[in-house]
Every structure is written in structure tokens, then in C-alpha cells.
């Protein structure tokens, strides 16, 4: 009966991937257990959806439950199995002819009992070799988890910058079109300024693009180094226990070097170029927008889209709470169906806001979303200390500084243009170009909590 119990516990505490006793055990949705390092490396190398290596059941998420009780079972099981130690593991003290079965915490040297009582080591803390093995093994697991988190963060940054690189040239070309469309409205003498602006934008775009490419290369190399370090730690955790104290010091130094060398993602932000006379020209079409308090539309779907977009910008390991930011919306009292109109909104005290124009019919509906038709909006969302700007139709990020005072909104109904300007900088934020308005428009303002 005792052998049956031993056989049962041994099979339960064996990893099906490495066929060894479980290290930092976890269980997935189907109930099978594996070493956390083995499962992490296996799932990262698999391009198909994450599935159990035993029963092939697909796991819906990467998060697994840690088995707290398993660690207590693995330790005595390891002790009950004869250790195949190298000859150096059973060293005999030359001076006292006794087995070195203690480890000094200070210099991590093997000692016999009499050596541990010598003046050199008497004030130091000592562990039995088996206790020290488990102590250093836990330290290794902590280092492995730290390395894996760094690798995951590096991979997220790499994916984000790869996506930016894929659309960067399109964004630069589109922004050049926006800027070029602004200048024909002003006098001929501004042509020279336009040319300088576009050339500087192209030059700045090339510089940031190269920064992104270099950062992408650094992150890719760091991912390889972190993977190698993680595999080395995994290999060390399976070595003869007596080698752990001597090797851990070098590993800790290398891990600290990798921590200091972790590449930081590039913040691809272009300069805000002043356009001469833009504020004066727009002020010719200034109107004063009042809010219609009688419109009580509740755009829950739009607010939900904003929260999820805000969460997608957060690269922390902690899950984002989509209800953390509360939004309230307001509609302008004026209905605009012709002519040129310009007004300004103070966003100085707002971190999260949505401002622009929407089709008048949306005032009577509650199903407006960020991808709905007939909305021309500029969004500002804050995550930690970073602000991101987006425009709708379609949703597009803008890598330029956010306005920190007054935001200007300009509508040219007949030409199908909606523009947003940074009043303090007299610079263009973005424009909706060559649209056809066949419906009335209303100003729309939405503010979110800080």
C-alpha cells in the first residue's frame, strides 16, 4: 500500500513536459499540472492557440492557478529519492575528516560542523545543505519569474513598435496631406513656410522612424538574451543541489545587468509647427457654442469603447479596470448645415475628453460608437502620465503634443472639412478632408474623470 501511495504521489508531482519533479507547479483549465517554466517556454514557441500538452484541450487564457500545496509535497518527495550527486557533493573536511554538511550564508562555502564553529565562521549563519538547497532554489524561481515578466513586457513593447512601424509611413504621408491642405487657404507668401514645414516633417519622420527601427532591433535582441537567461536559470534549477550557491552570485549580477539594459520604448512624437496666421484667419469665422441641456442621450456604448481604448494603451501587467473612468457627454444647441464656423473649447483641466461634430440624428439615439458613421471627433486619453490623441472615421493615432489650453474646432461645411487646432501653438492637430456632408451637424463634447 505504501508503494502505491508513493507511485500515486510521484505521478501527480511529475511534469509531463520535462518528465521531472514539478518546479514552481501550476495547473491549467483542464486540470493537468506542469512546471511553470516548461509551460511558459512551450506556449511561447507554439504558434497555435495555447493548449494542454497532455490532452490537447485549448486553454482560453494564459493565466494559470498556482498549486500551493504541491511545493510542500515535492520537497519530501525529492528527499525520498536518492540524489545522484557528483563526487564533489560528498566532500570530506581535510582538517577534521568530517563530512561537509553545512553551508555558510556569508561566503556560501561548504563546512563541516567543527569548521562552522571556528572564529572565522562562528558569527555567520549556517544552513544544512538540504535546507540551503531549497532556499537557493526558491531564489532561482524568483529570478526566473522576474526574467519572464521582463521578457513579456519587452515582447509587448516590441509588438507595439512593430505595429507603429507598419503604419508609420502611411501616417507621415497622411499628415503631409493634412498640412498641405491647410496652406492654400492662406496668402501666397506662406508657400515658403509650407515647404519648410513639409520638409522638416519628412526629416523628423525619418529620424523617428530610424529610432523606432533601432529600438525594435534592441528589443528583439533583449528578448533573446532574456530567453537565454530564463533557460539558464531553468537548467540551473535542475542541476545538482550543491552547485546552486556558487552559481547564483554570477546569475544575480547578470540579471542586474539585464535589468539596467532593458530598452525603453520610443515615444514617437512630432514637433508642433506653428502655421502663421492660422488663429487670425479662423477667428473670422468664430461662433459661440452653447450647450443644449434638454438633450438627455446616454451613449453607454461610446463610453465603453473609450474605456476599452484607454485600457489597450496600458502596458502594465495588471489587468485594466474598464469602469475606472466615468464619462459625461453634452450636445451643442446650434445645428450647422452650411457655411464656415469656428469655436474654441478649454481642455486645460481635462485629461480625458472627446470633442468634435456628429450627425444631428445621433442626438436621438443611444447606440453611437467610435466606429459609427457621421462622427468627426478628436480624442485625448490619459494612461499614467502619458497622453494619446486619436481621431475617428477611422480610428487613427496622432503622434503630436496634446493641447494643454484651448482647442479650436473649424467646420467648412461646403468643402467637407473639419479641422482641430492647438490655439496656444497656432498649429494643426488634424483635419478630416474632402468629406461630403449631406446631413446637419451638431457640436459634441464629452469629458472623462481624471
UniProtKB/Swiss-Prot annotation:
This is Tripartite motif-containing protein 77. CDD domains: Bbox2_TRIM43-like. A zinc finger (B box-type) spans 88-131. Belongs to the TRIM/RBCC family. GO terms for molecular function: ubiquitin protein ligase activity; zinc ion binding. The keyword Metal-binding applies. A zinc finger (RING-type) spans 15-56. Zn(2+) binds at residues 93, 96, 115, 121.
Amino acid at each position: 500500500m505504501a508503494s502505491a501511495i508513493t507511485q500515486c504521489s510521484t505521478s501527480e508531482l511529475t511534469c509531463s513536459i520535462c518528465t521531472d519533479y514539478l518546479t514552481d507547479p501550476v495547473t491549467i483549465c483542464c486540470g493537468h499540472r506542469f512546471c511553470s517554466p516548461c509551460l511558459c517556454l512551450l506556449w511561447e514557441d507554439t504558434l497555435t492557440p495555447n493548449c494542454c500538452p497532455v490532452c490537447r484541450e485549448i486553454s482560453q487564457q494564459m493565466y494559470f492557478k498556482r498549486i500551493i500545496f504541491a511545493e510542500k509535497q515535492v520537497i519530501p518527495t525529492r528527499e525520498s529519492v536518492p540524489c545522484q550527486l557528483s563526487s564533489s557533493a560528498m566532500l570530506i573536511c581535510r582538517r577534521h575528516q568530517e563530512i561537509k554538511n553545512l553551508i555558510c550564508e556569508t561566503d556560501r562555502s561548504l563546512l563541516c560542523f567543527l569548521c562552522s564553529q571556528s572564529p572565522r565562521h562562528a558569527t555567520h549563519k549556517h544552513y544544512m545543505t538540504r535546507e540551503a538547497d531549497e532556499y537557493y532554489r526558491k531564489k532561482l524561481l524568483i529570478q526566473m519569474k522576474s526574467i519572464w515578466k521582463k521578457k513579456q513586457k519587452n515582447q509587448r513593447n516590441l509588438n507595439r513598435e512593430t505595429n507603429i512601424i507598419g503604419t508609420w509611413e502611411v501616417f507621415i504621408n497622411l499628415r503631409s496631406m493634412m498640412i498641405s491642405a491647410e496652406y492654400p487657404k492662406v496668402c501666397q507668401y506662406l508657400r515658403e513656410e509650407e515647404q519648410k514645414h513639409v520638409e522638416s516633417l519628412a526629416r523628423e519622420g525619418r529620424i523617428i522612424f530610424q529610432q523606432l527601427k533601432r529600438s525594435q532591433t534592441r528589443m528583439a535582441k533583449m528578448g533573446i538574451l532574456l530567453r537565454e537567461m530564463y533557460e539558464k536559470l531553468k537548467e540551473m534549477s535542475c542541476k545538482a543541489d550543491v552547485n546552486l550557491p556558487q552559481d547564483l552570485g554570477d546569475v544575480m549580477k547578470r540579471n542586474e545587468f539585464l535589468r539596467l539594459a532593458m530598452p525603453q520604448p520610443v515615444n514617437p512624437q512630432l514637433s508642433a509647427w506653428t502655421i502663421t496666421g492660422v488663429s487670425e484667419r479662423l477667428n473670422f469665422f468664430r461662433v459661440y457654442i452653447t450647450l443644449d441641456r434638454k438633450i438627455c442621450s446616454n451613449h453607454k456604448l461610446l463610453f465603453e469603447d473609450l474605456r476599452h481604448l484607454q485600457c489597450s494603451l496600458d502596458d502594465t501587467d495588471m489587468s485594466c479596470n474598464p469602469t475606472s473612468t466615468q464619462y459625461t457627454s453634452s450636445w451643442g444647441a446650434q445645428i450647422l448645415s452650411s457655411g464656415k464656423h469656428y469655436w474654441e473649447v478649454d481642455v486645460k483641466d481635462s485629461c480625458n475628453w472627446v470633442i468634435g461634430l456628429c450627425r444631428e440624428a445621433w442626438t436621438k439615439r443611444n447606440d453611437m460608437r467610435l466606429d459609427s458613421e457621421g462622427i468627426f471627433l478628436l480624442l485625448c486619453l490619459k494612461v499614467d502620465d502619458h497622453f494619446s490623441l486619436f481621431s475617428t472615421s477611422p480610428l487613427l493615432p496622432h503622434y503630436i503634443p496634446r493641447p494643454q489650453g484651448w482647442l479650436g474646432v473649424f467646420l467648412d461645411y461646403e468643402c467637407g472639412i473639419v479641422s482641430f487646432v492647438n490655439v496656444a501653438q497656432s498649429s494643426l492637430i488634424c483635419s478630416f478632408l474632402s468629406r461630403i456632408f449631406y446631413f446637419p451637424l451638431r457640436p459634441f463634447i464629452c469629458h472623462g474623470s481624471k
